[in-house]
Regions:
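Double-stranded beta-helix
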Residues: 1-13, 18-21, 103-126
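A short beta-loop-beta micro-motif enriched in histidine and acidic residues
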Residues: 51-65, 81-82
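Short beta-strand segments in beta-sandwich/barrel cores
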Residues: 54, 71-77, 93-94
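Short, conserved beta-strand element in jelly-roll/cupin
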Residues: 60-75, 115
């Protein structure tokens, strides 16, 4: 069965079971107690961006794989040695190391696929 990863995310549990979960705003507006059940394992999600990310985020428990499907973005990584900018255009990917704050500047409407462990994710305004 086909699914739209912008509207339906996939959660891969520690035991290898993949479960479809409502995506988009429905996912992110869940109460924190509900979100907790997705903290273990890996979340696969797709996002469409027309403007810069409104926040920085950091995943303390695992690296994140961020894959640009289309468009143009510059991913900013706040590394101990200073800000690193990674330009992605058309297609490309970046691995964001665990514990590294990151955001993206959007140069053209873009779609990105993200694979990460959500537990403990922190956010702050951009």
């Amino acid at each position: 069965m086909s699914l739209n990863p912008q509207r339906t995310y996939v959660h891969h549990s520690e035991d290898g079971v993949a479960t479809e979960v409502p995506g988009g705003e429905e996912f992110w507006s869940q109460p924190e107690a509900e979100m907790g059940r997705y903290g273990e394992g890996w979340l696969v999600s797709e996002f469409a961006f027309e403007s810069d990310w409104p926040n920085w985020e950091m995943h303390p428990n695992a690296d994140e794989f961020a894959y640009l499907l289309s468009g143009s973005v510059e991913v900013h990584l706040e590394r101990p040695e200073g800000l690193q900018r990674v330009a992605l255009k058309g297609s490309g990917a970046v691995v964001v190391p665990r514990g590294i704050w990151h955001t993206a500047k959007v140069a053209a409407p873009s779609r990105m696929l993200h694979i990460t462990r959500g537990a403990g994710t922190e956010q702050r305004p951009a």
